[in-house]
């Protein structure tokens, strides 16, 4: 899609927010995530069952292998003593049983991996779907107070991180927990003294894990934050690349990028350093336990209180006992990132939505288009009022022009009329009904808009025009294009109406974009028309043609025209002259010129050289 403004289709105040905060409420966020995943209850239960089964079969394996070792050892001893030697049939039977267990374990592990991948991808899909639907229910003020990068980060970085970490961590938690419990039971069965020797290393392991996690958490937090900042900066620079070039700001932009990229690098390598240090340290501690068990096992074997095969099994269990503890520690680190991403997603999904009238909403089908502003007051924040006690009565079919300097409140009036924002005081009525009594969607269906910043999406010219009326016929589409004086240039394009407009809409000129948006508005056939600098981006000849088409379109419709080029609104029925949120003058073109006031000064300043 192409939208040439960063903060919303009609501008407004904006500020950036630093994304990527660490989860403020780890427990609460994980509870929300578990509740969110309830819809996948059945496959998750299957994952748990298959993961436990796979792990249990693996746990039993060393014991069976130990039995084979014991059998071979006893056979060798008997052979030396003049006995029958090794019972190969029994050993073969044991090994076949072991092979069957490992094959079954691998199959169960493969199945649970497939199911978990399906679950994690479904969670990501559902979250993106929920976020996409949520976006369309959010008030305009949300997007005008945040950068594109922050909002996009929720849909891309956070959801991707969440899906990947779920896929890795969920099965790891199940298998590691099962393995710790199962291996502990098997070690107890073999030898309590050797088990105690292993357990003595646990406090050291836990202490190291706690130390590493406490050191790494701030860096993981900073990494997510700087990644969000970097994404926002890249998007911002790319969308404004022409401006950067025009003002020779390449070096400045590169330095800013290097600064943020450097912060990301520093936080990333530190977080990965601490995370990577966990495995070697845990292996070191595990080796200490391994040595202790070897010495103690040799002593017990000499005392003939334990078999050689049992020592071998126990040594394997020592390895299998320390490994899942390390894995759980790594999962703990991963869950910090998971929780941070999940919290940001849930924060967005829980954001306040536009208030919609659900019951007894007034229908818009019979409305004619009389618009009344009654003592309207509004400000984007409590400290600054933009519209002050604004009142005007617009009759059906009138062409109303709104003029004034930048910041006078012209575009804000349109936002209020379409309920992108609600008034702080007073009311706006259409045919005597407060617009807050309509459904927002019904109210906005009454309007056709042509904005100063064109919005086209990556599709054919035909589909972009049809956006104004999705069920329009080919004849209607071409009729709208002709009325907007766009048909000729469309026919000269490769493919005509089938030509694809690229993602940035830079394969057609700015004036051609404007013509297509006007054609789209004509096709929509609205009751109320809004033109916000509709001809400001085209040349004089095109402007004249568009103006004639607009005059035909506005015939019989209530129309609001916002323009700085006063030549386009001389024939308006009413001209509202705004300054600092107030109507300072009101009347038609001749009346306002005769007054010699603010409008006359604006007009004369534009045409003094004519």
Walk through the language-model features, giving the residues of each.
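Short intracellular "coupling" helices and adjacent cytoplasmic loop segments at the cytosolic face
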Residues: 16-21, 121, 129-153, 157-159, ...
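A short amphipathic helical element positioned immediately N-terminal to and/or at the very start
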Residues: 26-41, 151
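An intracellular "coupling" helix at the cytosolic face of ABC transporter transmembrane type-1 domains
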Residues: 140-141, 159-166, 170, 174, ...
């Amino acid at each position: 899609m192409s939208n040439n403004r960063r903060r919303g289709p009609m501008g407004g105040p904006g500020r950036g927010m630093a994304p990527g905060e660490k989860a403020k409420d780890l427990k609460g966020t994980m509870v929300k995530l578990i509740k969110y995943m309830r819809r996948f209850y059945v496959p998750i239960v299957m994952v748990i069952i298959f993961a436990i089964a796979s792990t249990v079969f693996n746990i039993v394996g060393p014991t069976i292998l130990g039995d084979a070792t014991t059998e071979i050892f006893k056979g060798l001893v008997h052979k030396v003593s003049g006995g029958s030697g090794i019972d190969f049939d029994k050993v073969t039977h044991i090994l076949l049983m072991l092979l069957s267990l490992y094959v079954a374990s691998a199959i169960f592990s493969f199945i649970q991996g497939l199911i978990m991948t399906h679950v994690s991808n479904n969670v990501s899909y559902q979250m993106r779907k929920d976020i996409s639907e949520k976006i369309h229910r959010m008030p305009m003020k949300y997007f005008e107070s945040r950068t594109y990068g922050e909002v996009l980060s929720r849909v891309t970085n956070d959801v991707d991180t969440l899906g990947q970490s779920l896929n890795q961590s969920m099965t790891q938690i199940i298998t590691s927990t099962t393995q710790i419990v199962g291996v502990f039971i098997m070690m107890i069965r073999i030898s309590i003294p050797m088990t105690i020797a292993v357990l003595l290393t646990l406090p050291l392991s836990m202490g190291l894990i706690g130390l590493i996690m406490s050191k790494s958490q701030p860096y993981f937090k900073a990494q997510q934050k700087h990644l969000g900042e970097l994404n926002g900066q890249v998007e911002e620079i790319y969308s404004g690349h022409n401006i950067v070039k025009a003002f020779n700001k390449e070096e400045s932009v590169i330095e800013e990028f290097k600064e943020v990229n450097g912060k990301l690098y520093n936080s990333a390598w530190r977080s990965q350093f601490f995370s990577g240090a966990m495995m070697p340290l845990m292996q070191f501690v595990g080796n200490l336990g391994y040595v202790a068990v070897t010495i103690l096992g040799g002593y017990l074997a000499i005392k003939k209180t334990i078999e050689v095969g049992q020592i071998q099994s126990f040594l394997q269990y020592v390895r299998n006992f320390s490994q899942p503890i390390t894995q759980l520690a790594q999962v703990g680190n991963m869950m910090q990132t998971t929780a941070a991403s999940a919290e940001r997603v849930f924060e967005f999904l829980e954001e306040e939505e536009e208030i919609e009238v659900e019951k007894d909403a007034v229908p818009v089908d019979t409305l004619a288009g009389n618009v009344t502003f009654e003592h309207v007051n509004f400000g984007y924040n409590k400290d600054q009022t933009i519209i002050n006690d604004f009142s005007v009565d617009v009759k059906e079919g009138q062409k109303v022009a709104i003029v004034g300097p930048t910041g006078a409140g012209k575009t804000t009036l349109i936002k209020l009329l379409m309920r992108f924002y609600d008034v702080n005081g007073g009311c706006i009525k259409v045919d005597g009904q407060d617009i807050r009594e309509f459904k927002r969607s019904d109210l906005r269906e009454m309007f056709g808009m042509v904005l100063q910043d064109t919005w086209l999406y990556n599709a054919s010219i035909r589909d972009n025009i049809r956006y104004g009326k999705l069920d329009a016929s080919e004849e209607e589409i071409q009729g709208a294009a002709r009325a907007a004086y766009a048909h000729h240039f469309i026919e000269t394009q490769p493919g005509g109406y089938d030509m694809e407009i690229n993602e940035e809409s830079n394969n057609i000129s700015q004036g051609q974009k404007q013509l297509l948006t006007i054609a789209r508005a004509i096709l929509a056939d609205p009751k109320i028309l809004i033109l916000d600098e509709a001809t400001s981006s085209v040349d004089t000849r095109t402007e004249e043609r568009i103006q004639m088409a607009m005059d035909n379109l506005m015939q019989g419709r209530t129309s609001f025209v916002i323009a700085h080029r006063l030549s386009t609104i001389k024939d308006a029925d009413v001209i509202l002259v705004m300054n600092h949120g107030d109507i300072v003058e009101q009347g038609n073109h001749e009346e306002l010129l005769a007054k010699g006031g603010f409008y006359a000064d604006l007009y004369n300043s534009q045409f003094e050289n004519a």
